[in-house]
UniProtKB/Swiss-Prot annotation:
It comes from Bartonella quintana (strain Toulouse). Its EC number is 5.4.99.25. This is tRNA pseudouridine synthase B. The active site is at D49. GO terms for biological process: mRNA pseudouridine synthesis; tRNA pseudouridine synthesis. One of its GO terms (molecular function) is tRNA pseudouridine(55) synthase activity. The lineage of its organism: Bacteria, Pseudomonadati, Pseudomonadota, Alphaproteobacteria, Hyphomicrobiales. Coiled coil: none annotated. Responsible for synthesis of pseudouridine from uracil-55 in the psi GC loop of transfer RNAs. It catalyses: uridine(55) in tRNA = pseudouridine(55) in tRNA.
Length: 270
């Protein structure tokens, strides 16, 4: 008889709408939240690049079953493109690969935006989690290999130029569907404008049905979870009372609010 392995942690369920800081990986954020809630199970609904900040929905327990629904939800990003340089990662982290002295005018940028609105074809960055013959594209890129990544359809519902604080940079906001790479937008727009570009700053503000009002920071979570609790020399709480921190969770069913609802007539319902 096979002995069933006992699950570690609490069977707590719900959503933490985490305000991920720059520099933290999405998987690291999940591990930290799982530890803080002492949850048996945890997962996130859409990776955010380490250099990006903002809304990262993290599901605990039974809420992990609703992750696919949230991943289908629309997302909003506010980002800054730095003109004049294209980089290997399409953001600040990579090496400079192309340089231009040209800077786009506001009129040129506005004229280009309609081409990037609606359903478009987009090629993901070389440094991405896309699998190529069983390997992650970013692993191959780190080995110096240039891989052929097929373009894919993505949908951008709205694309706004918010401001151009300097000739070097422009701030945008988009609402888009699943699978959209903002870094690819910076790369492709820079090429179309003849000046090159990369992402200088990126923040996600919504993942339907969650928004900025739902955000909570690591500092806020930690303050509630560890308030008046002794920490031993290994950084582990000596005793825990999860009542207060559990009150910060958004109910599991909230994830289903992004699903389409249909009204059936009595005849069709039968």
């Amino acid at each position: 008889m096979v002995r069933q392995r006992k699950k570690r942690g609490r069977p707590v369920s719900g959503w933490v709408i985490f305000d991920k800081p720059k520099g933290m990986r999405s998987t690291e954020a999940v591990s930290q939240i799982k530890w803080l809630f002492h949850a048996q199970k945890a997962g996130h609904a859409g990776t955010l690049d380490p250099l990006a900040s903002g809304l990262l929905p993290i599901a605990l327990g039974e809420a992990t079953k609703t992750v696919p629904y949230v991943m289908q939800g629309t997302k909003t990003y506010r980002f800054q493109i730095a003109w004049g340089e294209e980089r290997s990662t399409d953001d600040l982290e990579g090496e400079i690969t192309h340089i231009s002295s040209k800077r786009p005018t506001q009129e040129e940028i506005l004229a280009l935006l309609p081409q990037y609105t609606g359903v478009i074809l987009q090629t993901p960055p070389q440094f991405s989690a896309i699998k190529i013959t069983g390997n992650r594209a970013y692993d191959l890129a780190r080995e110096g290999k240039v891989v052929e990544i097929p373009p894919r359809q993505v949908e951008i519902e709205t694309f706004k130029l918010i401001e151009t604080p300097t000739r070097e940079r422009s701030v945008f906001e988009i609402t888009c569907g699943k699978g959209t790479y903002v870094r690819s937008l910076a790369r492709d727009m820079g090429r179309d404008l003849g000046c090159y570009g990369h992402i200088a700053d990126l923040r996600r503000t919504t993942v339907a049905p969650f928004c900025e009002d739902d955000l909570i920071t690591w500092e806020e979570l930690k303050a509630v979870a560890l308030d008046k609790i002794a920490i031993n020399e290994n950084g582990i709480p000596s005793e825990r009372n999860f009542t207060k921190i559990d009150e910060l969770l958004i109910e599991t069913g909230a994830a289903l609010k992004c699903l389409s609802h249909y009204t059936l007539s009595e005849t069709r319902a039968q």
